[in-house]
Amino acid sequence: KSNFELTRAYFLFKIIGNSTVVKITTSITKFALKFNLPVTFLIKATVFDHFCGGVSEEDCNPVINKLFKNNVHSVLDFSTEGFNSEYEFNECLKKKISIIEFIKNKEEIPFAVFKPTCLGSTELFIKKSLGKKFSENEELMWSRVINRFEKVCKKAHENNIKILIDAEEADVQKAIDDLAILMMRKFNLLKPIVFNTVQMYRKDRLAYLNELINNKSNDKVVFGLKLVRGAYMEKERQLACERGIESPICETKNDTDNNFNLGLDFVFNNLERISFVCASHNENSVLKVMDMMKNKNISSNDSSIWFGQLYGMSDNISFNLAKRNYNVFKILPFGSVKNLMPYLIRRAEENTSVSGQTGRELQLIQNEKNRRSKLKS
């Protein structure tokens, strides 16, 4: 990073570390964008450029090339949210297909990614997850969702590109899990193409993993799994509180850490059937995976194991892994500033809620600034 980028990062994480400032800034930004006030340039020059790759695929190329020179791969994520109509779902499908076309034969971009509710309505996913009976029209709409999933995964399969299916809120996750395994049964028979995301801050995810392996219908499947802690903690807890139900999220960070570690144990006990991504900003989790690989005599660049972090976060982890020849990528969101605001707000809220994350980022940035100052003197 340049000195300017380091200073900007320090400034941003200072703001993110204050939950009150995050709430106020978020409200002001939403208001400004809603009424088309001239704030886009300011957002683009600060938080957008720090956490996002650009406004288009081509616009991301300088970042992609810069990362790859340091042995860090990229995953392009068209991160717009809030689609509601069949037209929008079909447009999103076209975009995902075009991204796969754009990245095929690009060594620096080994994965594609998509958010399930970009291909179908959230309400439909919720109803399917609850096991409620569809109307005739809803059955037709759901068949189109399945068809969109299949088209994306088939395109990835045809071009030998791995594809990550994002996890979402607990309300919709059961339907996503079912679609993910349906796609794996079609496209993961010889090698892993489709990867489902498992949020280990949920209390039920170990049971889900065991069910995957033990289900006889999956005997021929090579599983693709991306393990994360989770990105919707505040929202999940708030919804559970409003509904008067038990939260699906682990009670404490320690419980989540234990769950994540048990998930890693599960993966390494079943590596003959699993290819996986350790998508974590937690140094201890990354070190644990490295130790487990060493104990099993797995080479650092084994194609079945990847590490992933978000662009703009945990550069110390990503670049140190790359330096040691591990497979690592950065998720690189792109799109218009306005469309990416839900993603950027979630990043700010997540960093505020994750204990110690912002402090670690600030300390690492300060250490690098100090190192550069010493080199000058």
Locate predicted features.
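Positively charged, amphipathic and often flexible ligand-engagement surfaces
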Residues: K1-S377
